[in-house]
């Protein structure tokens, strides 16, 4: 299987969920073995962020990558939904030029990003696609009962369970398993929106968070249930969105993962902690390619320009 980039550049603009800052984002094709590289083009000189687990420095309600320049922290927040879409489509190499400190939230899911990527077209490249294959179990947990682990599996399977004491959540909608392929990702999780509790908004805004949030780009929950007039896109949209987030957070590894991911009450911090634990143990994984055989993960073939 070959590496993939975009066939053409494409632009999007929007508002950041937490900062409320407007930004223009340009996705541009990149050469083989470049990886995914975010670029703050509003900075002089331009600040580059080649994705890796170590670049994630803040995980309060979103995944934020940070570089230092002239003793100043330069950030890009809320990258997880775009990273999730890139993983879903199977993009290996891409420059992401952005004019502010947060990726636009769009509708709160990954569906707008997938539309952008498919509109630009997918270009196959003359190099083998690399995968990270899990060889042994790696597990992390936190003091709040959150657990995340990798284990060997021929494919990419995600098991996620959440636990919220709230009327909008019920037991039948708090667990989900996704056997990853592009088709399954598009159909099962790409449209699931981020969510938040109305009671927390005042506190968040005091911390300069949630400044761009609204019912047009998130699911709002009050003490009785969902506030959005249109309701949920799926009964279990909450756990579907958690899987969407996890797919994006785990793609910070730099390559698709072949293995099983199991999580309970995990979030951006624990997802990143798991990736760091994985790369810290060279015996836990290997980088593999599939030149003469089909990989255990299937990517859609639509919009591919050879």
UniProtKB/Swiss-Prot annotation:
NCBIfam families: lpxC. It comes from Hydrogenovibrio crunogenus (strain DSM 25203 / XCL-2). Zn(2+) binds at residues 81, 241, 245. GO terms for biological process: lipid A biosynthetic process. The active site is at 268 (proton donor). Belongs to the LpxC family. This is UDP-3-O-acyl-N-acetylglucosamine deacetylase. Pathway: Glycolipid biosynthesis; lipid IV(A) biosynthesis; lipid IV(A) from (3R)-3-hydroxytetradecanoyl-[acyl-carrier-protein] and UDP-N-acetyl-alpha-D-glucosamine: step 2/6. One of its GO terms (molecular function) is UDP-3-O-acyl-N-acetylglucosamine deacetylase activity. GO terms for cellular component: membrane. PANTHER family: UDP-3-O-ACYL-N-ACETYLGLUCOSAMINE DEACETYLASE 1, MITOCHONDRIAL-RELATED (PTHR33694:SF1).
